[in-house]
């Protein structure tokens, strides 16, 4: 399955200078958060692929104007073409903003999903905004990853953890792909 993964920064070839070839063959679009609702809504006009999203720490505006035609999968397992995707948005709490959690709060969110995870026999993709603890995160509080995500990877072994929040614009040698516990 061809999946387009989006996070944090609108891609100009899909937004300002639409290149429809970039969407050819895409069967699913996943957003890791912090993208304008208008951007995601715009993409629904050019593809039949479902667009699934989780909230980033800057997505408080979605409460008033969510991305039209897109599906929020927060705390939900969504199945598309046999691929099981779990969404857990938000970042580490560093201010009073929306979609921010403490380590304990995120662990509680994950814990509440145990029955769903058992029924679905796990997930193939864990879609998050923040990274897992010590797997692509930064040392400052705002960009630290969640221990609950690392524990999740080690327990459930999804094929992929897709996250945003920390990206190449922070430093040139940012690793886009990592392997941990088979994920």
Language-model features: where?
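Conserved beta-sheet core of the metallophosphoesterase superfamily
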Residues: 44-45, 50-59, 64-69, 138-183
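Short, hydrophobic beta-strand segments that form beta-sheet elements in well-ordered domains
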Residues: 5-7, 28-33, 50-56, 126, ...
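N-terminal active-site segment of His-dependent metallophosphoesterases
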Residues: 1-46, 118-122
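Flexible loop residues that form catalytic
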Residues: 34, 131, 166
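Secondary-structure boundary/capping motif
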Residues: 1, 83-84, 159
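A generic local structural motif
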Residues: 14-20, 37-41, 71-73, 111-115, ...
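Conserved catalytic scaffold of divalent metal-dependent phosphoesterases
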Residues: 5-14, 55-144
């Amino acid at each position: 399955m061809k999946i387009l993964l989006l996070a944090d920064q609108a891609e100009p070839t899909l937004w300002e200078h639409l290149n429809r070839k970039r969407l050819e063959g895409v069967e699913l679009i996943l957003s890791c958060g912090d993208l304008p609702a208008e951007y995601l809504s715009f993409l629904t006009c050019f593809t039949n692929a479902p667009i699934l999203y989780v909230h980033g720490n800057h997505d408080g505006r979605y409460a008033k104007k969510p991305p039209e035609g897109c599906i929020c999968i927060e705390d939900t397992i969504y199945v598309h073409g046999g691929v099981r995707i779990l969404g857990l948005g938000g970042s580490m709490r560093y201010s009073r903003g929306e979609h921010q959690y403490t380590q304990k709060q995120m662990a509680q969110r994950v814990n509440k999903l145990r029955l769903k995870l058992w029924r679905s026999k796990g997930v193939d993709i864990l879609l998050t905004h923040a990274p897992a603890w010590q797997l692509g995160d930064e040392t400052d509080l705002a960009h630290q990853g969640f221990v609950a995500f690392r524990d999740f990877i080690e327990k459930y072994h999804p094929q992929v953890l897709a996250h945003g929040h920390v990206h190449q614009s922070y430093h040139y040698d940012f690793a886009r792909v990592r392997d941990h516990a088979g994920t």
